[in-house]
């Protein structure tokens, strides 16, 4: 009997508990003294079969899977699509060209063109350059100005430096753009009302 242990050895205390039946995580290594490869979840879920139809040695015992008598398979079923050797994997079909024929123009969805018959017809034709596209840059420019103004305000808050002349210039430019946008919309509304 080795030193440091008191009393007689109990056979129940010397045995380790059986591995858990749930999926082990990386932190459950203390339960068993087996190597890390025994904790591979995929080895426990999918027990590889030998050519004779019996589970591979060691894997079934570690996984706690009982080996049932299996009839020798007549033919091995093919792997699911996308699995198997790279030479046997089918290439995915190319993207159908008919699905992406609509041009991607997110601003057309969020920004309605000014009213007018020539604008309505030309806005539906893809690739046409109209004054509407020039007016669509106003919201983009306003957004860019707002972003620059917010950046300057953040620099003021963090104390990294503040350029008051640039801030005043950007504010004046933003106000000028807003006034120009309002003026371009007001004549269209007054003409449609009269």
Curated annotation (Swiss-Prot):
Transmembrane segments: none annotated. Residues 73-96 have a biased composition (Pro residues). Signal peptide: none annotated. Residues 1-21, 73-97 are annotated as: Disordered. This is Uncharacterized protein C11orf91 homolog. The lineage of its organism: Eukaryota, Metazoa, Chordata, Craniata, Vertebrata.
């Amino acid at each position: 009997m080795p030193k440091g242990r008191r009393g007689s050895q109990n056979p129940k205390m010397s045995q380790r508990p059986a591995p858990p039946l749930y999926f082990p995580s990386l932190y459950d290594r203390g339960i068993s003294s087996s190597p890390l490869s025994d904790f591979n979840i995929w080895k426990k879920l999918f027990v590889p079969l030998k050519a004779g139809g019996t589970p591979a040695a060691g894997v079934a015992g570690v996984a706690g899977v009982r080996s049932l008598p299996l009839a020798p398979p007549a033919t091995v079923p093919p792997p699911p699509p996308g699995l198997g050797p790279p030479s046997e994997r089918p290439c995915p079909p190319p993207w159908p060209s008919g699905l992406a024929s609509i041009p991607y123009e997110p601003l057309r969805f969020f920004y309605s063109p000014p009213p007018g018959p020539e604008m309505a017809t030309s806005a539906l034709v893809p690739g046409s350059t109209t004054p509407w596209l020039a007016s669509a840059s106003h919201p983009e420019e306003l957004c860019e100005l707002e972003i620059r103004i917010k950046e300057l305000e953040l620099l003021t808050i963090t104390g990294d430096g503040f350029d008051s002349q640039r801030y005043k210039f950007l504010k004046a430019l933003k106000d000028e753009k807003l006034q120009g946008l309002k003026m371009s919309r007001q004549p269209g509304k007054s003409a449609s009302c009269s």
